[in-house]
């Protein structure tokens, strides 16, 4: 074999290798492009305590790995802290609302619980268990609980305080429902990616309190869908940050802002009217018309109330071509969220994947 033919052979091998590398790069670029299409970004928005974090927990239960016993154990301290936080809020409100304790001994119990530094709570033992039990059974505290719209109290208060014996058991392990009910204000941004039908859904939860909202802005690129949560039960409540502003008015103002943002022009909007279970309870004694005088429907009618609230939000949409998809939800009810999210997923996939022939 001559030198020339050996060189030609080597060259063609090199050329082949170069072409192979080039083809591989092209293939990878095509793959990346396709994968980018297959990742859908869902932005969870809504005011503080509307249920966004609970919704993410449900995605982990329904479409992810769920919560192992070890994971659940990690919530034990938070459950204890939620109980102390709730009782302290009611003890403070007893003073503010000038409600007396029915039983004299509960004043000492209140003092004991009031002095606890909640951040440092890591156990739930006596004398605190008995003190909190005794306080919860005091008619004064029960009256204070009934007036909770006048101050800030977690929605999970009754759930935990009605189950103190179980939580106080030394072998207590939080249940899935306990995990769903734990309240930890979201600071910063939480992302939860999960895989469905070879499509990655990346759900992004941002803090709802006003101080957290300035951090949202960089989440707004390439958003497939806005999922906006409203707590139906907030029609008679005031804001954490400002006690003379109605929470639902704040939620409406935020929704109006979000749906008119120019960078959401191509994002679908899904409205979750959440906490429908709490609305059903509350509507029996707290009348919608007292807070929204334009309501002219029947009193004590949860169905009429929620339809009115839905219409209030849908009417904020200035673009008649843009459909707002809506669902009534209870974020702590796994079966309800499983059912609702199946419908939402179909909506999102149909709207966004038709053009890529992936459905």
UniProtKB/Swiss-Prot annotation:
Q: What is the effect of changing residue 9 to S?
A: Abolishes palmitoylation
Region annotation (G1 motif) maps to 41-54
One of this protein's GO BP terms?
Answer: action potential
KO phenotype (gene knockout): Mice are viable but suffer from cerebellar ataxia and display deficiencies in primary hemostasis due to a defect in platelet activation. Mice lacking Gnaq and Gna11 are embryonic lethal due to cardiomyocyte hypoplasia. Mice lacking Gnaq and with one single intact copy of Gna11, as well as mice lacking Gna11 and with one single intact copy of Gnaq die shortly after birth; lethality is caused by heart malformations. Newborns display craniofacial defects.
Binding of Mg(2+): at which residues? Answer: 53, 186
Which key words tag this protein in UniProt? Cell membrane, Golgi apparatus, GTP-binding, Hydrolase, Lipoprotein, Magnesium, Membrane, Metal-binding, Nucleotide-binding, Nucleus, Palmitate, Transducer
EC category name:
hydrolase
Q: How does it sit in the membrane?
A: Lipid-anchor
Q: Where is this region: G4 motif?
A: 270-277
Cross-referenced InterPro entries? Gprotein_alpha_Q (IPR000654), Gprotein_alpha_su (IPR001019), GproteinA_insert (IPR011025), P-loop_NTPase (IPR027417)
Q: Which reaction does it catalyse?
A: GTP + H2O = GDP + phosphate + H(+)
Specify which residues bind GTP according to the UniProt entry for this protein. Answer: 50-54, 156, 180-181, 183, 274-275, 277, 331
Q: Where is the lipid attached (S-palmitoyl cysteine)?
A: 9-10
The known PTMs are summarized as: Palmitoylated by ZDHHC3 and ZDHHC7. Palmitoylation occurs in the Golgi and participates in the localization of GNAQ to the plasma membrane.
Tell me the GO molecular function terms: alkylglycerophosphoethanolamine phosphodiesterase activity; enzyme regulator activity; G protein activity; G protein-coupled receptor binding; G-protein beta/gamma-subunit complex binding; GTP binding; GTPase activity; metal ion binding
Domain of life of the organism encoding this protein: Eukaryota
Which cell locations does it reside in? Cell membrane; Golgi apparatus; Nucleus; Nucleus membrane
Q: According to the UniProt record, where is the region G3 motif?
A: 201-210
Instruction: Identify the stretch(es) annotated as G5 motif.
Output: 329-334
Domain annotation G-alpha: ranges: 38-359
Protein family: Belongs to the G-alpha family. G(q) subfamily.
Note the subunit structure: G proteins are composed of 3 units; alpha, beta and gamma. The alpha chain contains the guanine nucleotide binding site. Interacts (GDP-bound form) with RIC8A (via C-terminus); promoting GNAQ folding and association with the plasma membrane. Binds NHERF1. Forms a complex with PECAM1 and BDKRB2. Interacts with GAS2L2.
The protein here is known as: Guanine nucleotide-binding protein G(q) subunit alpha
**Organism source for this protein?**
Mus musculus
* Gene name tied to this protein: Gnaq
């Amino acid at each position: 074999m001559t030198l020339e033919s050996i060189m030609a052979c080597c060259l063609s091998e090199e050329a082949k290798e170069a072409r192979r590398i080039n083809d591989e790069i092209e293939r990878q670029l095509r793959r990346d492009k396709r994968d980018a299409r297959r990742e859908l970004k869902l932005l969870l928005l809504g005011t503080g305590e509307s249920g966004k974090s609970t919704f993410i927990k449900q995605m982990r239960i329904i479409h992810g790995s769920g919560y192992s016993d070890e994971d659940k154990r990690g919530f034990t301290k938070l459950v204890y802290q939620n109980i102390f936080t709730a009782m302290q809020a009611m003890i403070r409100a007893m003073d503010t609302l000038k409600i007396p304790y029915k039983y004299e001994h509960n004043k000492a119990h209140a003092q004991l619980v009031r002095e606890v530094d909640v951040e440092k709570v890591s156990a739930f033992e006596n004398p605190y268990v008995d003190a909190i039990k005794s306080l919860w059974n005091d008619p004064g505290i029960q009256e204070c609980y009934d007036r909770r719209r006048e101050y800030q109290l977690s929605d999970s208060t009754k759930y935990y305080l009605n189950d103190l014996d179980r939580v106080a058991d030394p072998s207590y392990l939080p249940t899935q429902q306990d995990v769903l009910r734990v309240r930890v204000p979201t600071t910063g941004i939480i992302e939860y990616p999960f895989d469905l039908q070879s499509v990655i859904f990346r759900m992004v939860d941002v803090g709802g309190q006003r101080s957290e909202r300035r951090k949202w802005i960089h989440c707004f690129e390439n958003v497939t869908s806005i999922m906006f949560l409203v707590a139906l039960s907030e029609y008679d409540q005031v804001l954490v940050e400002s006690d003379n502003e109605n929470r639902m008015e704040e939620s409406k103002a935020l929704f109006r802002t979000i749906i008119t943002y120019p960078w959401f022009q191509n994002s679908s909007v899904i409205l979750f009217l959440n906490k429908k279970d709490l609305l059903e309870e509350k509507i029996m004694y707290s009348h919608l018309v007292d807070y929204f005088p334009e309501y002219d429907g029947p009193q004590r009618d949860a169905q009429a109330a929620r339809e009115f609230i839905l219409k209030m939000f849908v009417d904020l949409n200035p673009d008649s071509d843009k459909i707002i998809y809506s669902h009534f939800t209870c974020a702590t009810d796994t079966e309800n969220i499983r059912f609702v999210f199946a419908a939402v997923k179909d909506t999102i996939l149909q709207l966004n994947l038709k053009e890529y022939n992936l459905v």
